[in-house]
Regions:
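Terminal amphipathic alpha-helical/low-complexity segments used for targeting or macromolecular assembly
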Residues: 1-84
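Structural signal for interior beta-strand "rungs" in well-ordered beta-sheet cores
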Residues: 82-183
Length: 183
C-alpha cells in the first residue's frame, strides 16, 4: 500500500520495469508510445493507478486541494480503465504487476490483496463469490494465464501458475501449477 511519495515512485518504477523492461531509453519509450504497444498502455494504466492510490491514501485527508487532486486522478484512471476494458481496484495489487496483453481487455481484479510481481493475461476475472467479504487473497509471483478465473474466499499461495481457462475455487498451496474446471 502506498503511504508516501517515495512509495509511489518505487511502485511506478517497479511497474515500469515489469511492463517495459529494464533498459528502455526515452527514445524507445516514445517510439513504443507512438506505435501504441501493449506494454506502454499497461504502464500508463498502472502509473495512473499508483497516482490515484497515492492521492487516496495521502492527499485526500489534506483539505480541499487534496480532494481536488484525488478527483482528477480518479477521473483519469477510470478513463483509462474504460479505454482498455480493465477493472482493477485501488490498493489491491502489489508492485511489479504485469499485463502482457491489455488490448484484448476483459480483465477484472477485485481481491482482498494481491502480492508483488504478479501478472494477469486477457480475460482474467478475480472476484467475490456471493458477498463482498468472499474475495481471494493472492500471494507473490502468481501468474494468471488467458481466461483464468478465481472466485470466493480462497488463498492462492506464492509462486503459483494458473493454467489457461482454469477456474480456481479452492485454496492453492505455494509453488504449484493449477489447471482445470474447477481447480
Amino acid at each position: 500500500m502506498i503511504q508516501s511519495k517515495e512509495d509511489m515512485r518505487f511502485y511506478i518504477q517497479e511497474d515500469k520495469k515489469r511492463n517495459l523492461g529494464t533498459n528502455v531509453s526515452s527514445i524507445k519509450y516514445i517510439a513504443k508510445w507512438l506505435y501504441g504497444t501493449d506494454d506502454v498502455k499497461a504502464y500508463r494504466l498502472f502509473k495512473a493507478l499508483r497516482k490515484l492510490e497515492y492521492a487516496k491514501n495521502c492527499l485526500y485527508k489534506k483539505g480541499l486541494w487534496g480532494k481536488a487532486i484525488f478527483a482528477f486522478r480518479k477521473l483519469r484512471y477510470h478513463r483509462l480503465e474504460e479505454r482498455y476494458d480493465v477493472a482493477i481496484g485501488t490498493n489491491m495489487v502489489g508492485y511489479g504487476f504485469r499485463l502482457p496483453h491489455i488490448v484484448g481487455g476483459g480483465i477484472i481484479i477485485n481481491c482482498n490483496s494481491m502480492g508483488n510481481y504478479c501478472g494477469a493475461n486477457v480475460g482474467v476475472v478475480i472476484g467475490n463469490n456471493h458477498t463482498w467479504d468472499e474475495r481471494p487473497t493472492i500471494g507473490d509471483h502468481v501468474g494468471f494465464s488467458i481466461g483464468s478465473k478465481a472466485y470466493g474466499n480462497i488463498h492462492i499461495g506464492s509462486h503459483v501458475t494458473i493454467a489457461p481457462n482454469s477456474v480456481v475455487i479452492k485454496d492453492v498451496p505455494d509453488n504449484s501449477v493449477v489447471s482445470g474446471v474447477p481447480a
